[in-house]
């Protein structure tokens, strides 16, 4: 699996490609998913429980959720769903990591 570099040309035309998003807190995961859809891609969104917006489930082509201590499961989730490129978008609240 390859991480997205952030280069705008990398997302110029996704032609149905499934891109993974590990989603934390804030608007950035939503904006990232919308940008991928605008470029013809599909999104597999794995949200971090108690961090991500609930609305992400409605815009995901494939959706899952993990706890903050289970982030390592993201690779399995993305591989299982055929994702070849993925990115993380959004904040992880440090305070919740230790609870």
Where are these regions (language model features)?
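Short glycine-/acidic-enriched loop or helix-start segments at secondary-structure transitions
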Residues: 31-32, 55, 97-99
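N-terminal glycine-rich phosphate/adenylate-binding segment common to multiple enzyme folds
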Residues: 71-99
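N-terminal beta-loop-helix "entrance" segment that forms/cooperates
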Residues: 48-67
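N-terminal basic/disordered segments at the start of proteins
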Residues: 2, 7-48
């Amino acid at each position: 699996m390859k991480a997205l570099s952030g280069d705008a040309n990398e997302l110029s035309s996704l032609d149905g490609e499934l891109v993974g998003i590990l989603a934390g807190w804030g608007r950035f995961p939503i904006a990232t998913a919308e940008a991928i859809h605008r470029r013809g891609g599909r999104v597999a969104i794995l949200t971090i429980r108690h961090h991500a917006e609930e609305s992400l489930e409605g815009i995901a082509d494939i959706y899952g959720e993990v706890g903050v201590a289970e982030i390592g499961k993201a690779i399995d989730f993305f591989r299982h769903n055929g994702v070849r490129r993925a990115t993380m978008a959004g904040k992880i609240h440090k305070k919740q990591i230790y609870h």
